[in-house]
Amino acid sequence: MADLPLAPGETIGILGGGQLGRMLSAAAARLGFDVAILDPEPDAPAGRVAAHTIVAAYDEPKGLQALAALASVVTFEFENVPAAAVAQLAEMGVEVAPGPLALRVAQDRLEEKTFLNAHGAPTVAFAPADTPEAAVKAVATLGAPALMKTRREGYDGKGQRWVEHAADAARAFAELGGAPVILEAAA
């Protein structure tokens, strides 16, 4: 476990070497930290600025062990890395921030809103839907317009559709691939 705050010269591990990982690596380097990136892509953008690059799947045990050996603390560049990998790093004794629970909750919009409400944080009204029929019913209950979002792996507006009328919900559900969704009332 790392003694926080970290001292310059220590290594920050990052799961993910995309553009966000690159920006985080550059900022860490300016503050005097080394960065170790774990990413499945050999030419990940963050690898160009990180002190260490580990090319492995996010849940590859040897890759995780290599990252744990290098890093005083580990984070992740986005919420779509496997929560189990973050849990494995924590089990190895590596300080991981945010932790596995935060990542798991953030990976599912329904779980996220339910968690927030359970802990006293208000959200817009919402309803889950696993079928086109359930989506139509959810919009009828919440009122239109409503924002339909995939429960997992959406980002930067991807995986979202505005539903202007309950009758449009089945079409929007199909456009999003038929995966489980959450509908949010317009604020």
Where are the regions a protein language model picked out?
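ATP-binding N-terminal substructure of ATP-dependent carboxylate-amine bond-forming enzymes
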Residues: 1-107, 111, 133
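Glycine-rich beta-alpha junction loops
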Residues: 42, 152-154, 187
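CheY-like receiver
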Residues: 66-67, 115, 138, 171-175
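Short catalytic-loop micro-motif centered on adjacent basic/acidic residues
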Residues: 73-76, 98, 124-125, 182-185
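Short secondary-structure boundary segments
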Residues: 78-79, 150-151, 185
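Acidic/polar active-site rim loop that often engages polyanionic ligands
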Residues: 94-96, 115-121, 149-157
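Glycine-/Pro-rich loop/turn segments that contact NAD(P) or position catalytic residues
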Residues: 104-145, 160-163
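Conserved ATP-binding module of the ATP-grasp superfamily
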Residues: 122-124, 145-148, 159-187
